[in-house]
Amino acid sequence: MTSTLRVAFAGTPEFAQIALAALHQAGLPIVAVLSQPDRPAGRGMHLQASPVKQYAVSHGLGPVLQPPSLRRTGKYPQEAAAAIDALSAQQPDVMVVAAYGLILPQEVLDLPRFGCINIHGSLLPRWRGAAPIHRAIEAGDAETGITLMQMDAGLDTGDMIAMEHVPIGLTDTTGTLHDTLAALGGRMVVEALARLAQDGSLPATPQPAEGVTYAEKIAKEEAALDWSRQSAALLRQVHAFNPFPGASAELDGVSIKFWQAEALPDRPADAQPGAVLAADADGVVIACGAGALRVTQLQKPGGKRLPAREFLQGLPIRPGQRFASRA
C-alpha cells in the first residue's frame, strides 16, 4: 500500500510494536516515533529500550522521541517542548497511538492534520483505562475486541472510528488474548488509514453514555489468591494475571505462582478454603469457597514454570497442607 499520509506513531510495549510493524509493513511513511524513555530491566537492571523503540531503530524509522512527559507546564518542560517541536517539524498528517503510557496534551492532539487515532484493547466504553485485557478476563466477559478511537482530552472517551469483536475462550489468558488483539489492532488501523487517505476523513460515532467501566492498572498485590472465593472466579484470576503478575499463594512461607488451572465444581463439604485435596501428576487440587481449583502449571521462586508432575518432584505438596489466603 502506498500512501501520501505522513504518519507519526506513539507507543511503548509489544502491543504497540505489533501495530507499528503493521503500519511499516503496509508501506506507510512513519515520520516520527514516540516511546517512553529507556527503563532498567532484567536481573542486571540495565537500561532497556521499549519494544517500539527497538523496532523503530532496527528499521530506520524516526526520529525516535522519548520525552518523560509531553506537558510544557509539567515536571520536564524543556524535554516536553523539545519533543513537541521535533514532532511538529515532521508535519505529520495523523498520529497513531497504542499503549503509549503518557498523557497527550491538547496541543499534541491538535498537531496532526487529522488528529490522533488510538488503538484500544476493549469494546468501548467498557474497560476504559490501562488494563482492559486483564480486566475483561477477570470479570468473566464473553467477548472483548479492538476499538479505534479519535482521541480527545478524556481517558479513552473519544468518538469511535471502528470496532471489531473477539470472543474470550475458556482457556484464554491475557497473553493469548493480547497477541490476538494486537494483530487485530494493527490490521484495523492500516485499513482505517487507507480509508483516510482515500476519503480525506474518517466518520466517527460518540461512545454510548451507558456501560462505562474502568480498567485500573494491575497492582502486584492483586496476584495473591483469596481461597474463600469461588473456583470459577479464581480461575479467571489465574488467566487474567498470566503472564503478569502471575496469580500466587503462599504455602508454608513459600510463594508459589499458578499459571494454568481448571475449575472443579465440587469439593468435600468439610474442606477448608486453601486446603490441598490432592497433589499428583494431574495437578494440585485446592479447596475454594465453592468448588476447587486444579492447578496444572506452577512456579516456585527462582524457578521455571513447570507442569505439576515436574514441579512436585522438586517441591513436594501433600494433601492436608493449606495455602494461605490474601489478607
UniProtKB/Swiss-Prot annotation:
Its EC number is 2.1.2.9. CDD domains: FMT_core_Met-tRNA-FMT_N (cd08646), Met_tRNA_FMT_C (cd08704). SUPFAM superfamilies: FMT C-terminal domain-like (SSF50486), Formyltransferase (SSF53328). One of its GO terms (cellular component) is cytosol. GO terms for molecular function: methionyl-tRNA formyltransferase activity. It catalyses: L-methionyl-tRNA(fMet) + (6R)-10-formyltetrahydrofolate = N-formyl-L-methionyl-tRNA(fMet) + (6S)-5,6,7,8-tetrahydrofolate + H(+). Pfam families: Formyl_trans_C (PF02911), Formyl_trans_N (PF00551). Keywords: Protein biosynthesis, Transferase. (6S)-5,6,7,8-tetrahydrofolate binds at S122, L123, L124, P125. PROSITE patterns: GART (PS00373). It comes from the Bacteria. Attaches a formyl group to the free amino group of methionyl-tRNA(fMet). The formyl group appears to play a dual role in the initiator identity of N-formylmethionyl-tRNA by promoting its recognition by IF2 and preventing the misappropriation of this tRNA by the elongation apparatus. Belongs to the Fmt family. This is Methionyl-tRNA formyltransferase.
